[in-house]
Amino acid sequence: MNIPLTPIRFLQYAEQQFPGKTAVVCKDLRFTYAQFAERACRLAGALRKSGVKPGERVAFLSMNCHRLLEAYYGVLEAGAVLLPLNIRLAPHELAYILNDAGAKVLFLEKQFLEMADSFRQTLSRVQIFILLDERPQTNWLLPQNYEELLAAAAPYRADIMSFDENSTAELFYTSGTSANPKGVMLTHRNIYLHGLNVCLALHLSGDTVELHTIPLFHANGWGIAQALTFMGGTHVMLQRFDPAEVFRLIEQERVRACSLVPTMATALVNCPERGKYDLSSLERITIGGAASSPTLVREVEGKLGCSCFSGYGLTETSPMLTLSRMKSGVHWEGEQRYAGQAMTGYAVGGVEIRVVDSNDKDVPHDGKTIGEIIARSDGVMEGYWQQPEATAQAMRGGWFHTGDMATISENGYVLIVDRAKDIIVSGGENISSLDLEKTLAAHPSVYEAAVIPVPDEKWGEVPKALVVLKPDAKATEGELLEFCRSRLAHYKCPRSVEFLPSLPKTGTGKILKKELRKKYWGGQETIRPEFATKK
């Protein structure tokens, strides 16, 4: 017997097995799994009642909240495709995505009304606007808000056997660093099998209480959420990242786990209010979205009292590909353990990873030779929305090409050296900006750092460090340069250091290196050297 694989089954199972268990905590609201499932099915019924047909796109412009989590199941139950939108995008970027995806419905929070009003006349396909919270005085035609919509609808429960598991379930748009963002099509099968892998890799259970610190419209936000529902764990929603609020929720809800980007983890370990809260329930912090460092792993484990390791993946891979937990047969001690747990990690179950040269031939498993990470798994996307050429380029040879440059060791551990576009090519030598950033992070005065290439007449480009110091800390350019030279080959070290009050970041806390580079390249990065073929 073949039952279609769809994440709808995750919530159905949790409702059957854990109906009275707390499923979602959002501000002062709490929902059991029976209530969670009822609301998701009412959303499905409301969408069908509104004329939404199978395969049509339903967009959500929302911060982390219980309603967005309900959409991950209710929209799919209706047979539609969920389109979560990044709230940090500019109005013209949101308009592009809504038009490119052909969204029929847009759910949005009141705080985004003014912004959406600036582009709604340019939307070619959106027919229905629904407010997620109470209705303000507005010139918009908003006959109902979300709660009124649910109250007026009968629950709809789909016939699972009628689903095509290879049909698109969710459409996520990439950041579009060099062109318009691309829509990543994830199928019901992708999401279901990825969820099972996450359950195993992160040892999730019904006792897991997960704090959703990362927005659910991001890859490293939604991946765990789907899996946690299947296990009957508890979702705790965080609207905006604030260290004190994170600590308060950990104490109040007895949170056991959360995922962070490195800048979030850095903010937590440096928060002066940390000691005011009981963090004894916290067992695991997974760092993803950007490279970690041994220093950060050490500080998280020492100051927050929990295990800390890295996860790696992309929107196109659902997302998880690797995890840096110590695997059977590998034994690390002391600093070696911190370094290992800061690595990109080894392939999780169901994932195949290779590191290849420019001809897609495997590089030696020596932990030194640099190549590109390619992967295949049940979680790899169906393709890019209406972009067959981009899909073919990314999926050539039956493997997804990540664009991330890495080494691979004898025991299968992958270490990302850099994004291909962030590799610094100086005098024909490849220099990893991540290596430099990890080295700078070990300096006691450095809060965070970004290393970028800047033009140089002799070498083509050279590394430049942009550094934010810890509060009340002091360091000079010469001191930091000498610190790097004492730990790295001189040709790899920054040629200069600039101190900044802060670094530009995305909504999830990733450092925007593209913005930092603009000052030096004037937006003309195409003149930068290509990634060197010499390894």
Predicted regions and their residues:
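Structural core segment of the AMP-binding/adenylate-forming
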Residues: 10, 29, 45, 49-50, ...
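Conserved AMP-binding/adenylate-forming core of the ANL superfamily
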Residues: 3, 8, 20-65, 69-73, ...
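Conserved pre-ATP/AMP-binding loop-to-beta segment of ANL
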Residues: 19, 131, 136, 151-173, ...
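Conserved AMP-binding/adenylation subdomain of ANL enzymes
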Residues: 192-209, 217-257, 271-272
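Conserved AMP-binding A3 loop
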Residues: 32-34, 169-193
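Conserved beta-loop-beta connector loops within the AMP-binding
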Residues: 350-374, 410-411, 473-477, 512
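Gly/Ser/Thr-rich phosphate-binding loop
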Residues: 230, 252-260, 269-339, 352, ...
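AMP-binding/adenylate-forming catalytic core of the ANL superfamily
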Residues: 89, 106-108, 258, 377, ...
